[in-house]
């Protein structure tokens, strides 16, 4: 459980529970919601509470014109409601005038608002689990442009949402848009290391054998944390851009420049929040391989692979990449899950901890800072831990 002193029986005792718990899966988030529900049901049963599921069935059916509505199929009056949404699930489709449309983040966000409306203010409290923050990559204004994430957070607050739980936000400072709303930005560092060591138990984190490298300046904070807890050194790349041109909505990258010590003969770990097309990650890996890196392991909380898997297959085949880690917090294609080089990190239990803690009005501080669990994991694998 979240702390070593709390047992499932104490955690799910009725006198500590804020209100009866209900989970609602937005279309496209059913798998993750079911996994979260499985953990919660198991803990409740350990506490002597007989329950089959906490999930309240819901859907967002569409009319032939493309309009949709939110529908919750059982009462949630007085419940502590948690809605789970995956804005990155592009595999979901709907028909529009005879054409098949893939769901965009905008569609998923609209469905979330529909289901909040369907609850219609009857719930005791409404929380949103949005692992991939809607509009999170548009977190600041540089020109005459929208601030989608900030406006979305303000909309959710106005609709009565009390808590937002997100993972590895592109820039967590977006919470400044809603300073009076509970906002938890969760980093799955422990889950990533646990999966990595399970699949690569021979890893040696000594600074002579292992180095953490940030792919750009924006990812420095998460890579600094990895290097600090592992006790190894840190390097980084910075991107030189051509600010005179805009290609596909951004200034094109001219080159990746490396700042750091030699990587020759070392295992390199690169962490970022998103693998979109993956071009930057592959360019960084290629440059490190040219400098003599022995193995290169990439990690991204949200493995989108918007340009497909072929280039990553080629990078693994020619020895540039060793492995890629990604979480189950967003949709992953069946083709990706079948790749030998891809390691899937299960964060459903971690998410369930947050649901249970918030439902019982308990502190989540121990969940947000898992350093004790990380140190115990590294000690178990005889790796030098450093706080």
What kind of region is each of these model predictions?
Residues 1-387:
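PRPP-associated nucleotide enzymes
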């Amino acid at each position: 459980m979240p702390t070593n002193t709390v047992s499932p029986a104490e955690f799910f005792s009725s006198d500590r529970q804020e209100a009866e718990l209900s989970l609602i899966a937005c279309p496209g988030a059913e798998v993750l919601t079911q996994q979260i529900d499985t953990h919660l049901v198991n803990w409740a049963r350990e506490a002597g509470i007989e329950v089959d599921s906490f999930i309240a069935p819901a859907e967002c059916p569409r009319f032939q014109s493309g309009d949709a509505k939110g529908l919750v199929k059982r009462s949630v009056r007085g419940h502590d409601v948690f809605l789970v949404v995956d804005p990155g699930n592009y595999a979901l489709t709907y028909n529009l005038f005879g054409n098949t449309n893939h769901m965009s983040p905008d569609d998923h966000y609209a469905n979330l608002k529909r289901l909040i409306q369907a609850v219609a203010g009857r719930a005791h409290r409404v929380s949103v689990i949005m692992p991939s923050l809607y509009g999170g990559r548009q977190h600041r204004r540089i020109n005459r442009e929208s601030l989608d994430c900030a406006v979305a957070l303000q909309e959710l607050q106005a609709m009565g949402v009390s808590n937002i739980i997100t993972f590895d936000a592109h820039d967590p400072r977006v919470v400044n848009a809603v300073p009076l709303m509970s906002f938890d930005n969760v980093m799955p560092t422990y889950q990533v290391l646990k999966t990595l060591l399970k699949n690569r138990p021979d890893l040696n984190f000594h600074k002579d054998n292992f180095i953490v490298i940030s792919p750009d300046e924006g990812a420095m904070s998460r890579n600094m944390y990895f290097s600090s807890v592992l006790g190894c050194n840190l390097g980084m790349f910075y991107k030189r851009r051509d600010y005179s041109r805009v290609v596909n909505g951004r200034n094109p990258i001219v080159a990746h420049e490396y700042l750091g010590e030699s990587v020759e003969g070392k295992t390199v770990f690169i962490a970022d929040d998103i693998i979109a097309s993956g071009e930057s990650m592959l360019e960084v890996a290629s440059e490190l391989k040219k400098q003599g890196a022995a193995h290169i392991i990439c990690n991204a909380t949200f493995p989108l692979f918007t340009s497909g898997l072929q280039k990553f297959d080629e990078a693994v085949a020619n020895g540039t990449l060793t492995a890629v880690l990604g979480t189950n917090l967003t949709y992953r294609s069946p083709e990706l899950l079948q790749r030998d080089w891809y390691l899937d990190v299960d964060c459903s239990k971690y998410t369930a901890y947050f649901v249970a803690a918030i439902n019982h009005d308990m502190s989540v501080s121990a969940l947000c800072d898992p350093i004790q669990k990380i140190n115990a994991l590294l000690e178990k694998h005889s790796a030098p831990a450093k706080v």
